[in-house]
Amino acid sequence: MSDIKLNYHKTHFLTSAPDIRALPEDSGIEIAFAGRSNAGKSTALNALTNQKSLARTSKTPGRTQLINLFEVEPQCRLVDLPGYGYAAVPEQMKIQWQKALGEYLQKRQCLAGVVILMDIRHPLKDLDQQMIEWAVASELPVLLLLTKADKLSQSARSKQVKMVREAILPFQGDVQVEAFSALNKTGIDRLAAKLDSWFAPVLSE
């Protein structure tokens, strides 16, 4: 484990890409953020970086259709992947997204970890499980963030976290589960600590 702590508040937008072929060179370390279209992915990125509009939050889920890259430090990037599984998106587009997501997880050499965000009230939908499977198959560590934790009481929250921790045991990969709330800042420290540990190899060079 590294003791180097990155300052995520310095994160800035780098570039957008329609697919993996248009991404910048495959070097340094990238950490991907993935989740259903309404899981609160952009909100979590904004909370982590303490910037209100770093990642555009949208009232229309499924808005983030590009792969958006943000730079924390040189060689350290956060990648906001297109939200998946929104009903109002045409089937053809859904298939394209899923193909792009799968391709990115399997082929991107600099990808060091995946943060998968799920609404704590509706975790582990089919596509969430697919993402965990892909990540584990690609030997990538996963942090599952159960978002919108402020919507539940403390006891209901603990119960959901425990349930998800038990449900993911069959995946057998390096998967950690944490409750998260952008509203009352729950889980932000744990998210930052996990990212620090994933970025550590490039920082200690």
From Swiss-Prot:
Q: Name one GO molecular function term.
A: GTP binding
Q: Name one Pfam family in it.
A: MMR_HSR1
The entry sums up its family as follows: Belongs to the TRAFAC class TrmE-Era-EngA-EngB-Septin-like GTPase superfamily. EngB GTPase family.
Reply yes or no: does the keyword Cell inner membrane apply.
no
What highest taxon heads this organism's lineage?
Bacteria
Q: What is the lineage of its organism?
A: Bacteria, Pseudomonadati, Pseudomonadota, Gammaproteobacteria, Pasteurellales
UniProt protein name = Probable GTP-binding protein EngB
Q: Which residues form a coiled coil?
A: none
Q: Where does Mg(2+) bind?
A: S42, T64
The task this protein performs is described as: Necessary for normal cell division and for the maintenance of normal septation.
SUPFAM superfamilies recorded: P-loop containing nucleoside triphosphate hydrolases
| Cellular component per GO, a single term | cytosol
NCBIfam families membership? GTPase_YsxC
